[in-house]
Amino acid sequence: MASGILVNVKEEVTCPICLELLTQPLSLDCGHSFCQACLTANHKTSMPDGERSCPVCRISYQHKNIRPNRHVANIVEKLREVKLSPEEGQKVDHCARHGEKLLLFCREDRKVICWLCERSQEHRGHHTFLMEEVAQEYQVKLQAALQMLRQKQQEAEQLEADIREEKASWKTQIQYDKTNILADFEQLRHILDWVESNELQNLEKEEKDVLRRLMKSEIEMVQQTQSVRELISDLEHRLQGSVMELLQGVDGVIKRMKNMTLKKPETFPKNKRRVFRAADLQVTLEVLRELRDVRRYWVDVTVAPNNISYAVISEDMRQVSSPEPQIIYEAQGTISQTFVNFNYCTGILGSQSITSGKHYWEVDVSKKSAWILGVCAGFQPDAMYNIEQNENYQPKYGYWVIGLEEGVKCNAFQDGSSHTPSAPFIVPLSVKICPDRVGVFLDYEACTVSFFNITNHGFLIYKFSHCSFSQPVFPYLNPRKCTVPMTLCSPSS
């Protein structure tokens, strides 16, 4: 710090002609001081009758007004007693390339240069001026830049404050959402534990992700603000310092200033986020209430033996499975296995004939890769052996059923189109969780058949409306070609 002050003082008492400390300093009317010997030599080179002017500012002066400057001479004497470090002197006063005094300013390159630099190829043809001649111009420019940077500092600080406020707001909002979610789930915790856990995990993940990104933005805003402050500090130091400090490296400062663009922080609008609300919970509760209501009509369903069906039925008349593949001995002693060719031959009706009222039952289909179940208006023995694959499964033929294929494809079967009336219209069903247990609700008077995914807390899988029940209907089960049994559940299970 002290060395910097001494360098500034030395610059003020340096002769502009010889660039050394003033010796027997003389001052002109304009205020510039020169060594007595330097000023005398300058007079000799001037025209005898020519007008004398200051070598620095070119202002005319009269010889009789030249006066010794004892004050400056005293400063020089004191300064000679102090030895500046050669590094600092080199850094401030001399050209790093040529070691000459830095006296000139190149307008094209915006650099302080020495007289050898001016004559070099690098600056040939450039406009050069004494530093004092351009100091005022850059004083104005840097002052304007300082004002602009101060404004940017205010903007940066405001952005920093905004991001902190948003971070606090997010934390408050997340905590508020947590409280609401916990309060809503308390009503039916024993049923909705999995929903609560899932939603809270998502919310916490969102909190961590958003706060992490906001923290990153905050760090970037702090760094941005610090960069502006550092540049402001640099400019303030230049503006308060000497001409040398003002102009040295000014090109880099101006480039940094021009290239500085305040980066806006990443934000996360709260109105666009998807958060679990009480309304979502209300949907779940409505489903549970609907399931609770239909379960009041749970009837104990069993299957009836049927000579037409090839299905395997358990002794308690609750389990139905497809027969094992038949072993066939062919010619030359070869052995092959085959399933029953008729898809419908494994279908079977429940023992209950339904002609009115509301009825509900559940079927366990866990571990099965294929099945069909629902309601049937009764077999058509004369026609069934002529029907292949799924063609019979249409409401117009008395089937209101859904099914599973390949372990993942859940479908409903509607009437075929006018172009293909014999083939059913297969409706792919979107189920988040493949059902292991299916509830079937038949409302005979309302002409509806509904299917519920008990595995997914009773969410509706599919509903047939406007059913035409012109005759008694029965529960229907078909294990398909999967030997794993499907089981009719008792009301107490």
From Swiss-Prot:
Span of zinc fingers (B box-type): 90-131
Gene3D superfamilies per the UniProt record, alphabetical: 2.60.120.920, Classic Zinc Finger, Zinc/RING finger domain, C3HC4 (zinc finger)
Keyword Lyase found: no
GO cellular component, one term: P-body
Subcellular location: Cytoplasm; Nucleus
Principal subcellular localisation of the protein: cytoplasm
Chain positions found as Phosphoserine: S85
Annotated ranges, domain B30.2/SPRY: 281-493
PANTHER family (alphabetical): E3 UBIQUITIN-PROTEIN LIGASE TRIM
Quaternary structure and interacting proteins, as annotated: Can form homodimers and homotrimers. In addition to lower-order dimerization, also exhibits a higher-order multimerization and both low- and high-order multimerizations are essential for its restriction activity. Interacts with BTBD1 and BTBD2. Interacts with PSMC4, PSMC5, PSMD7 and HSPA8/HSC70. Interacts (via B30.2/SPRY domain) with HSPA1A/B. Interacts with PSMC2, MAP3K7/TAK1, TAB2 and TAB3. Interacts with SQSTM1. Interacts with TRIM6 and TRIM34. Interacts with ULK1 (phosphorylated form), GABARAP, GABARAPL1, GABARAPL2, MAP1LC3A, MAP1LC3C and BECN1.
Name of this protein: Tripartite motif-containing protein 5
Organism of provenance: Hylobates lar (Lar gibbon)
